[in-house]
Structures are given as C-alpha cells and as structure tokens.
Design a protein with these regions (language model features):
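N-terminal intrinsically disordered/low-complexity leader segments
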Residues: 1-18, 206-219
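Helix-turn-helix
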Residues: 22, 26-64, 68
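Conserved hydrophobic residue
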Residues: 36-37, 156, 185
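Hydrophobic alpha-helical connector segments
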Residues: 68, 82-112, 165-168
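Amphipathic alpha-helical packing segments from all-alpha helical-bundle domains
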Residues: 75-78, 116, 126-152, 162-166, ...
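Helix-loop "lid/cap" segments that line or gate small-molecule binding pockets
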Residues: 84, 100-108, 116-123, 197-201
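Amphipathic alpha-helical segments used for helix-helix packing
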Residues: 94, 107-127, 144, 177
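Hydrophobic alpha-helical segments that form the core
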Residues: 157-177, 189-200
C-alpha cells in the first residue's frame, strides 16, 4: 500500500504559491539536523514529497539551494527586524528594539535559518559567499552606526563600536544553542533580561541610574 503523504507534503505539491518556500524550509530543517555535507538531494526531495527530477525543476543545484536558504533567512530577518527598527529616530531605542526582535526571531521558529547562516556560510563559494557576506556586513554596519549615534547623543558611554556590535550579535545569535521554548524562561522575558545585561554596560550613569540591570525590568 502506498504511503499517505504527510499534510505538509500535500500542501507542498498542491499550492504553487508556497511550494518554493516549503522546499527551502524543508531543506533548512534537514541541513540543520545532518549538516550540508550529510544532506543529499535525494534526502531533500524525499522529505519534500518530490522526485529528484521534480526537485531540480525548482532548484539549480545543491549549493544554489544553500544560497537561497541563506538569502531567505536574511529576507526574513530584514522583514521581521530591520524594517521595524530602521524608522526609529532614537538610536538607543532603535538598538533595544532591534535586540528584542532579534531574540524573538530566533526563539519563535526561525532558528534553522539562523543556524545555517552561522554555520554553513563558509560552504558557499565565489559570488554566492560574497553576496551573503555583503548582507551580513550591512547589518554589522547598521549596529555600528546606531551605536555611534548613541555615543554622540550621550546615551551610551564611548566604546569601540565594532566590539560592541559583535558583542550584541554574539548574545542574540547563539540563543538557539541553549534556549528551549518549554523551559523556565519565556522568550519575552529572555529578550528583556538580555537587554538589561547588554545595555547596562553601555548606558551612561545619568541615564542608567546608580544601580544597573534591575532584575526582570524591561529596558
């Protein structure tokens, strides 16, 4: 008896609007579980409910699929984080909102794409790697620029903006390694506490008060 396709497979085969996105998400899940080298085109096609020939109708190659996954992850990040924080005029508030949205992005269903951007970027070669690196560098520049603005306005103390930007990224991008949705810390509380920890080390005493990093208080 033929196996009944899983609901996600049926949706993948019948809804052309979501088909490509579903392939990317299926491939992202497999690559997170098995690594890029350990995931074959056959694995992806089977998980997506397609033949290899059917899969190649949607992708050029395995490496190009990896590029598309990373671009998809960056697209999601820009939609759910950057598009909301770029219009914020106050640089400190912009940074705080950026951290909160970053944390929620990683903890609420997009950790696969973050994992692949972090761990599989070196697998890409040539123009593909340059394209992803350019997008990542734009985000680092955004953080450095926002930090520099906050220094100029006296909201945070003078610091090396590159060091601060990468410290910011180090905090938020590696959450997926240890955060568990079913654990004792809800995602919203985690975002608040990480804001307290990070910005308590940056804000001037005039803004931060005598004691920094109040327990559980949202920045």
């Amino acid at each position: 008896m033929a196996r009944t396709p899983k609901p996600e497979r049926r949706a993948l085969l019948t809804d052309p609007r979501d088909r490509h996105r579903a392939i990317l998400e299926t491939a992202a899940r497999l690559i997170c579980e098995k690594g890029y080298e350990g995931t074959s085109i056959h694995d992806i096609a089977e998980a997506a409910g397609l033949t290899k020939a059917g899969l190649y109708h949607h992708i050029r190659s395995k490496e190009h699929l990896l590029l598309e996954i990373q671009n998809y992850g960056m697209d999601v990040f820009e939609e759910k984080v950057l598009s909301h924080v770029l219009p914020i005029a106050d640089p400190l508030q912009r940074l705080k909102e950026c951290m909160e949205r970053n944390v929620l992005l990683v903890t609420q269903g997009w950790s696969k794409e973050v994992t692949i951007i972090l761990h599989e970027h070196a697998t890409l070669t040539g123009e593909a790697r340059a394209q992803i690196n350019a997008r990542k560098k734009r985000y680092v520049r955004f953080l450095e620029t926002s930090l520099a603005e906050a220094i100029r306005t006296g909201q945070i103390r003078p610091v090396n903006t590159k060091v601060a930007a990468f410290a910011f990224l180090g905090m938020v991008l590696w959450i997926y390694k240890w955060f568990r949705p079913e654990g004792a810390i809800p995602a919203e509380r985690l975002a608040s506490e990480m804001q307290d920890l990070f910005f308590a080390g940056l804000e001037t005493r005039a803004r931060g008060g005598g004691k920094r990093g109040g327990k559980g208080k949202k920045a």
